[in-house]
């Protein structure tokens, strides 16, 4: 079997082979070199078209030959020096100067038209081109470029629901002329979202199908005759689907073996696994030594990976980015101060979430700030589920998406998240105050151990869906954004909120009296679907001093008065 570098060299030469190579000419020569048997030669020679002969020739050569030298010698013998020179040049640069392989050898033979074709065949979704987060897109391109020579890797693109992870990944693949076709021979994009072992099995069954389909399409590729190319792709791809073996009763071991065999023909493929939820998906990809770009809400699944891992966090939109996004979709520029206030209110309520902003824009008919103010009011009184519409985002409301995040949390993390609704949004709150209300189970009366346990619980929530955000300066603090608080306020049981307020009052009073709070608490929490209530005003964004911890509820009196009014309705 050829080594990976030589497999890549054959893939890179594929277009040139289609233009000027007849496998029948090489069979007798390679039989003499003990590469092929008579059976191989008969099978390849009897193929009805040259494209099929090339496809089967390359497939057999990858498996039967131990090096490219015999084929290169044939090209020299057959006076096809352009093929010999290309393969020699590729192997020399790949071995001695890999950093110059792409600009010197590959780039001159690649075109934008081929990139678009590879993106289409790789199932890469077409995304918006009216707005782009250039910083994040360029970081993805840079990381994929840096890691392309690794045998296997994971690049995790992680962030909150609706933050635009899939859009950024798609835009990165579409923007760069270097990634697909130069750094990577091809791409396969698959949507995951599965939460069961069967879902993981189905995902990799689809991956096998995409690899087989990609091989058929590549084997019939002829960029000089586009109509014939399309017809061949359609007919061969349909045949490939019809002849695809059933994997209904195949074990996971057999499926992995089938994928590994298919990867011989696609040795340098980038796999984009979108919306990964389970660590089993990471384990499968690791066993198969895939090169993966992963989009996920839960960055903790990266713990299942041992190869090279890199991380890019997709943060909420900055205020200026929110303006640009809405303007790109046709929202008018604020003309007066009142319009600016309404727009800022929308940005605050959505916490710069692109999906939420898009839903507000799509629901804003007519496109006036008066209508936007009405939508803001609906959000405040009825929660995120009040605005529901069809957008490019896969959920009709952000509430449904966040609810899915909650469902995959452990019972302990879900209970901690429920009591996060007691905290005012947009405020960096020290762990000591969080410890007053977050339920944990410890066997010690040590106050520091309680704080450490609570900090660990809050850290998990910040990693599993960016439901909270942490900061270490000047002390360790955690913050709940407005959009998450707005979601929790209308799904957490009212009695749980009322109990949480009461517990917080009691613990803060004990802090003021220098009493040690009880470290073990098991407070029941329940989520509900709908309710109504008043939203809170914007509060100060400064870290409270330790001597003022007991005054926390007094400092944020307006918020707690509003929350108490909400629970009494």
Swiss-Prot record:
Plays a major role in programmed cell death (PCD, apoptosis). egl-1 binds to and directly inhibits the activity of ced-9, releasing the cell death activator ced-4 from a ced-9/ced-4 containing protein complex and allowing ced-4 to induce caspase ced-3 autoproteolytic cleavage and activation. Also forms a holoenzyme with processed ced-3 enhancing ced-3 activity. Component of the egl-1, ced-9, ced-4 and ced-3 apoptotic signaling cascade required for the initiation of programmed cell death in cells fated to die during embryonic and postembryonic development. InterPro entries: CARD, Ced-4, CED4_WHD, DEATH-like_dom_sf, NB-ARC, P-loop_NTPase, WH-like_DNA-bd_sf, WH_DNA-bd_sf. Residues 1-91 form the CARD domain. SUPFAM superfamilies: DEATH domain, P-loop containing nucleoside triphosphate hydrolases, Winged helix' DNA-binding domain. One of its GO terms (cellular component) is membrane. GO terms for biological process: actin filament depolymerization; apoptotic process; apoptotic process involved in development; defense response to Gram-negative bacterium; embryo development ending in birth or egg hatching; embryonic morphogenesis; muscle cell cellular homeostasis; negative regulation of apoptotic process. ATP binds at residues 131, 162-167, 171. It is found in: Mitochondrion; Cytoplasm, Perinuclear region. One of its GO terms (molecular function) is caspase binding. This is Cell death protein 4. Keywords: Apoptosis, ATP-binding, Cytoplasm, Magnesium, Metal-binding, Mitochondrion, Nucleotide-binding. Residues 116-442 form the NB-ARC domain. It comes from Caenorhabditis briggsae. The keyword Cell membrane does not apply. It comes from the Eukaryota. Associates as an asymmetric homodimer with ced-9. Upon release from ced-9, forms an octamer, known as the apoptosome, and interacts with ced-3; the interaction results in ced-3 autoproteolytic cleavage and activation. The octamer (a tetramer of an asymmetric dimer) also interacts with two processed ced-3 to form a stable holoenzyme. Interacts with sex-determining protein fem-1. May form a complex composed of ced-3, ced-4 and mac-1 or of ced-9, ced-4 and mac-1. Within the complex, interacts with ced-4. Mg(2+) binds at residue 166.
């Amino acid at each position: 079997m050829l080594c990976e570098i030589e497999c890549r060299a054959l893939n890179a030469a594929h277009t040139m082979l289609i233009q000027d190579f007849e496998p029948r000419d090489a069979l007798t020569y390679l039989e003499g070199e003990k590469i092929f048997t008579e059976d191989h030669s008969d099978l390849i020679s009897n193929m009805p078209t040259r494209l099929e002969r090339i496809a089967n020739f390359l497939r057999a050569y990858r498996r039967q030959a131990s090096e490219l030298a015999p084929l290169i010698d044939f090209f020299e013998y057959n006076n096809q020096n352009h093929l010999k020179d290309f393969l020699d040049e590729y192997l020399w640069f790949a071995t001695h100067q890999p950093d110059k392989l792409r600009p010197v050898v590959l780039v001159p033979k690649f075109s934008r038209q081929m990139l678009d074709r590879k993106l289409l065949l790789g199932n890469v979704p077409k995304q918006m081109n009216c707005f782009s987060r250039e910083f994040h897109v360029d970081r993805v391109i840079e990381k994929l470029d840096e890691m392309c020579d690794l045998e296997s890797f994971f690049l995790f693109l992680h962030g909150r629901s609706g933050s635009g992870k899939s859009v950024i990944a798609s835009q990165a693949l579409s923007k760069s002329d270097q990634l697909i076709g130069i750094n990577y021979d091809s791409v396969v994009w698959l949507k995951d979202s599965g939460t069961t072992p069967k879902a993981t099995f189905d995902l990799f069954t689809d991956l096998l199908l995409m690899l087989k389909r990609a091989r058929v399409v590549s084997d019939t590729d002829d960029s000089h005759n586009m109509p014939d190319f399309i017809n061949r792709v359609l007919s061969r791809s349909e045949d490939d689907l019809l002849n695809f073996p059933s994997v209904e009763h195949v074990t996971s071991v057999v499926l992995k073996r089938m994928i590994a065999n298919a990867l011989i023909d696609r040795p340098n493929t980038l796999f984009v696994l979108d919306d990964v939820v389970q660590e089993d998906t990471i384990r499968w990809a690791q066993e198969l030594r895939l090169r993966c770009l992963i989009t996920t809400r839960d960055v903790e699944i990266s713990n299942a990976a041992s190869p090279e891992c890199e991380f890019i966090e997709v943060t909420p939109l900055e205020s200026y980015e929110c303006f640009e996004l809405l303007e790109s979709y046709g929202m008018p520029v604020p003309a007066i101060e009142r319009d600016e206030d309404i727009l800022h209110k929308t940005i605050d309520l959505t916490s710069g979430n692109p999906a939420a902003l898009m839903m507000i824009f799509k629901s804003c008919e007519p496109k006036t700030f008066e209508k936007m103010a009405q939508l803001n009011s609906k959000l405040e009184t009825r929660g995120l589920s009040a605005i529901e519409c069809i957008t490019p985002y896969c959920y009709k409301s952000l509430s449904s998406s966040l609810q899915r995040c909650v469902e995959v949390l452990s019972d302990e993390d879900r209970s901690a998240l429920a009591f996060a609704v007691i905290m005012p949004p947009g405020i960096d709150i020290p762990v000591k105050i969080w410890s007053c209300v977050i339920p944990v189970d410890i066997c010690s009366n040590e106050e520091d151990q309680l704080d450490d346990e609570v900090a660990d619980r809050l850290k998990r929530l910040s990693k599993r869906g960016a439901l909270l955000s942490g900061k270490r300066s000047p002390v360790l603090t955690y913050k709940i954004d407005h959009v998450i608080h707005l979601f929790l306020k209308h799904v957490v049981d009212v009695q749980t909120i009322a109990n949480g307020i009461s517990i917080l009052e009691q613990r803060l009073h004990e802090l003021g009296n220098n009493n040690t709070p009880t470290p073990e608490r098991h407070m029941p929490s329940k989520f509900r679907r709908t309710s109504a209530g008043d939203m809170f005003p914007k509060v100060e964004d400064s870290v409270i001093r330790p001597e003022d911890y007991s005054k926390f509820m007094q400092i944020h009196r307006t918020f707690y008065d509003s929350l108490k009014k909400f629970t009494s309705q």
